[in-house]
Regions:
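A structural signal for multi-pass alpha-helical bundles of membrane permease subunits
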Residues: 1-2, 6-262, 268-269
């Protein structure tokens, strides 16, 4: 207690009144203003924020609709071995996600299996740097996330599809409805009604999806334009991975960290 009192009123701390100065919203203005002391901070934040929202959109809705499509195809009348197809897809869920992501990341390395096969077949003359190019890296993380997420969405969609009354489909078929009309008027509205809250939480979860981005890209590709006093960022960084790199980097500049943290929605993700 004596140490706390002494530290609070020593030469570095002139009482409680001078511990800090209120600055209002000036810190947020610095984050979005190009005329701030760290001018590149606002540009870097804007680029990472736009990619984060783009990633969250594609990661959420590609998995949702493709998982639903796979469930519809497996549940379709005339499809044999339905349990087998579901079992094969579920195997990807049984393997821990971080193992799958690290393994697939190595497949697309410069010396990985994918490049080795393309070189051997003569499709390319030199190895493709998948993770060093912004476009290819962003496409890959979205596609690999689809591969990881479709089985789970397939199971969720299967359970919901089995609860849709078949009388609705039979009645609409008698009225002359096409397969597409049945999907748009019966299947999709029912799915959205049941999974609406799930879609919202999934979107927020993908904004904070640290594992997929960090384990796949491992801090690639670097960009000379995304450099701030808090450290450099990559063109595949989400806000959450950028925050992690800033706090664990050599500079440990917590100013952009506090800004970024306040912009992140809170959601638990396994």
């Amino acid at each position: 207690r004596q140490m706390c009192i002494r530290d609070s009123y020593d030469g570095a701390h002139d009482g409680y009144s001078n511990l800090f100065t209120w600055v209002g919203l000036s810190n947020f203005n610095e984050l979005i203003s190009s005329s701030s002391a760290d001018a590149n901070l606002s540009y870097t934040f804007g680029e990472i924020l736009s990619w984060t929202l783009m990633w969250a959109f594609f990661a959420t809705f590609t998995n949702y609709f493709l998982g639903m499509l796979v469930a519809i195809l497996i549940n379709k009348k005339g499809i044999h071995f339905k349990k087998l197809w579901r079992g094969i897809l579920v195997l990807t869920i049984a393997v821990p996600q971080f193992i799958s992501l690290l393994y697939v990341s190595k497949l697309f390395d410069t010396n990985g299996v994918v490049n080795a096969m393309l070189l051997k077949l003569g499709f390319i003359d030199q190895a493709i740097r998948f993770w060093e190019n912004t476009t290819s890296a962003r496409i890959l993380v979205i596609v690999i996330n689809i591969w990881v997420g479709i089985p789970y969405l397939m199971l969720v969609s299967t359970g919901i599809l089995m609860n849709i009354p078949q009388d609705l489909y039979e009645s609409s078929k008698i009225d002359g409805a096409s397969v597409w009309q049945q999907y748009m008027k019966i299947t999709l509205p029912y799915m959205l009604f049941v999974t609406g809250p799930y879609l919202l939480t999934q979107f927020i979860g993908n904004i904070n999806n640290f594992n997929v981005i960090y384990l796949l890209t491992s801090g690639r590709p670097a960009s000379p334009d995304l450099v701030t006093s808090g450290g450099s960022a990559t063109t595949t960084d989400l806000l959450i991975t950028w925050l992690f790199n800033i706090t664990t980097g050599a500079t440990s500049n917590y100013k952009p960290v506090s800004y970024t943290h306040l912009t992140l929605p809170t959601n638990s993700r396994v």
